[in-house]
Amino acid sequence: MRAVVQRVSFSEVRVEGKLRGRIKQGLMVLLGIKKGDSKAEGDYLLEKIVNLRIFPDEEGKMNRSLLDIEGEILLVSQFTLYGDARKGRRPSFSAAELPELAEALFDYCVDGLRQRGVQVETGTFGAEMLLSIENDGPCTILLDSEKLF
């Protein structure tokens, strides 16, 4: 499982021109699920995400977590995080989980964040979406449950 975590002061997602989710201060998280991922990978990433100390403290140092600032998360599924462009010009997405299995794991992650006390907004799984992101910093962190980076 992979996540692109962006510290934002504002983010929203629209589906077919209609607002689907909007947050203020918090994290915009793009989540990719690969074949074979399980709840264990989800739990690992969720703990990382909510506890990442990437928000500034009183001295301006990145020392506070999403939980510390009581921030929100906009969580959007993105299978293209498992795109492999090493050969040719068209990426292969064969490492991405099948949609029906990925959706169940995505829903598990949404519930897991809410159980951790986080306000969560989402896009629509499998839909074409338009994201607006006001990246604060900018601050973008890449996470991988296999600890590849």
Swiss-Prot record:
PANTHER family named in the record:
D-AMINOACYL-TRNA DEACYLASE 1, D-TYROSYL-TRNA TYR DEACYLASE
Q: Which InterPro entries match?
A: Daa-tRNA_deacyls_DTD, DTD-like_sf
**Annotated signal sequence range:** none
Q: Which GO terms describe its cellular component?
A: cytoplasm
Q: Where does this polypeptide localize?
A: Cytoplasm
The record's GO molecular-function terms, alphabetically, read:
D-tyrosyl-tRNA(Tyr) deacylase activity; Gly-tRNA(Ala) deacylase activity; Ser(Gly)-tRNA(Ala) hydrolase activity; tRNA binding
Q: Which organism is it from?
A: Syntrophomonas wolfei subsp. wolfei (strain DSM 2245B / Goettingen)
Role according to the record: An aminoacyl-tRNA editing enzyme that deacylates mischarged D-aminoacyl-tRNAs. Also deacylates mischarged glycyl-tRNA(Ala), protecting cells against glycine mischarging by AlaRS. Acts via tRNA-based rather than protein-based catalysis; rejects L-amino acids rather than detecting D-amino acids in the active site. By recycling D-aminoacyl-tRNA to D-amino acids and free tRNA molecules, this enzyme counteracts the toxicity associated with the formation of D-aminoacyl-tRNA entities in vivo and helps enforce protein L-homochirality.
Q: What is known of its domains?
A: A Gly-cisPro motif from one monomer fits into the active site of the other monomer to allow specific chiral rejection of L-amino acids.
Subunit notes for this chain?
Homodimer.
Query: Its Gene Ontology biological processes?
Result: D-amino acid catabolic process
Q: Which UniProt keywords apply?
A: Cytoplasm, Hydrolase, RNA-binding, tRNA-binding
Question: Which Gene3D superfamilies does the record associate with it?
Answer: D-tyrosyl-tRNA(Tyr) deacylase (3.50.80.10)
Q: Give the family per the record.
A: Belongs to the DTD family.
The answer to whether the entry has keyword Nucleotide-binding is: no
Report what the protein is called. Answer: D-aminoacyl-tRNA deacylase
Q: Which domain of life is it from?
A: Bacteria
The EC code for this enzyme is 3.1.1.96
Residue window of motif Gly-cisPro motif, important for rejection of L-amino acids: 137-138
Q: What is the lineage of its organism?
A: Bacteria, Bacillati, Bacillota, Clostridia, Eubacteriales
The record's top EC class is: hydrolase
Q: Known catalysed reaction(s)?
A: glycyl-tRNA(Ala) + H2O = tRNA(Ala) + glycine + H(+); a D-aminoacyl-tRNA + H2O = a tRNA + a D-alpha-amino acid + H(+)
